[in-house]
A protein has these predicted regions:
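C-terminal subdomain of the subtilisin-like protease fold in secreted/lumenal serine endopeptidases
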Residues: 158-236
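A cross-family glycoside hydrolase active-site/sugar-binding cleft signature
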Residues: 3, 27-31, 58-62, 94-95, ...
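Hydrolase catalytic cores
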Residues: 121-188
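Loop/turn elements at helix/coil->beta-strand transitions in domains of secreted/extracellular proteins
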Residues: 1, 20-27, 51-57, 87-92, ...
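Hydrophobic beta-strand segments within beta-rich accessory/binding domains
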Residues: 227-261, 267-268
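Subtilisin-like peptidase catalytic core
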Residues: 1-44, 51
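Active-site-adjacent substrate-recognition loops and nearby beta-strands
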Residues: 8-11, 34-36, 42, 60-89, ...
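Sec-exported extracytoplasmic/periplasmic mature domains
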Residues: 19, 31, 46-53, 95-98, ...
Length: 271
């Protein structure tokens, strides 16, 4: 279903779209400032995720890769284009070339408060795309990468429902499955250019089909122990463990956006 309206209204109308039309994944490449911090839009998209647990907003990271947006690290850093893209519970998408190199124009992190942004990377260079009013052309930008991530997410949502009796997944779980199964690029681990790496939808789908995730909860002061059995043999080269939660919305202009699990101390023991 194609749904077009003023962008400002779209964010605030997602509750209606979520319940009336069953919208679970959105994609948008609109910009709203550069290194804008925790704005009213940021708060809204984080609130969207709290009020609509299965929702995932997918955004472009922006095309200001060489800009200095006063983050404090000089040109080329901290230039994500819009507060909504800096949300804690959304995906901001970087643009990589066919050779898995970050495009020079692709906006870099971190977020205003130092968090990892962008979150994920996808092909956004020389993508054959539609062009208004009725044409097609090869286009480059994070606006080309963003729809690719939204499409992969839609397939992963469908895979989850097929493996769980038609039940909608939690948006936070889907975002963590996507990012934790990405192909690491750039510096080892997540970084401010590629996020968690280039999307690998097949590996994320396999994680869903194999049930390689745990949904659990823990109360304040509790200790929860989870055992993970790793298959033996030469075929296992790496174990990735990601702790994910949907964080409540913060106040506008908050210097530090995270509100929960501020004293959490995850510990991993290999036996």
């Amino acid at each position: 279903m194609f749904h077009q309206q003023v962008y400002r209204l779209t964010l605030y109308d997602i509750d209606v779209d979520y319940n009336l039309y069953g919208i679970r994944v959105t994609a948008s490449s609109y910009s709203n400032g550069c290194n804008a911090g925790y704005t009213a839009f940021t708060r809204q998209v984080d609130l969207d995720a709290i009020q609509n647990p299965s929702l995932t907003h997918v955004f472009s990271a922006g095309n200001n890769g060489n800009s200095n947006c006063n983050y404090g690290a000089g040109s080329g850093w901290g230039n994500i284009t819009g507060g909504h893209k800096q949300g804690k519970n959304v995906l901001a998408t970087a643009n990589v070339t066919g050779a898995d190199i970050i495009a020079g124009s692709s906006s870099r992190g971190p977020a205003h408060d130092g968090r990892i942004k962008p979150d994920i990377a996808a092909l956004g260079t020389n993508v054959f795309s539609c062009l208004a009013p009725n044409d097609y052309r090869s286009i480059t930008g994070t606006s080309m990468a963003c729809p690719g991530i939204a499409g992969v997410m839609a397939q992963l949502y469908d895979a989850y429902k097929q493996n769980n009796n038609g039940i909608d997944p939690e948006g936070g779980l889907m975002r963590s499955l996507l990012t934790n199964n990405a192909d690491d690029l750039g510096n080892p681990g997540p970084d401010f250019k590629y996020g968690y790496g280039r999307v690998n939808g097949l590996r994320a789908a396999k994680a869903i089909e194999m049930g390689w995730y745990i949904k659990d909860s823990v109360a304040q002061g509790e200790v929860d122990t989870v055992n993970i059995t790793v298959p033996g043999g030469n075929g296992v080269g790496e174990l990735r463990v990601m702790l994910h939660w949907t964080d409540p919305q913060a106040t506008v202009n908050a210097g530090r956006a995270f509100k929960s699990l501020t004293n959490a101390r995850p510990a991993f023991t290999v036996a």
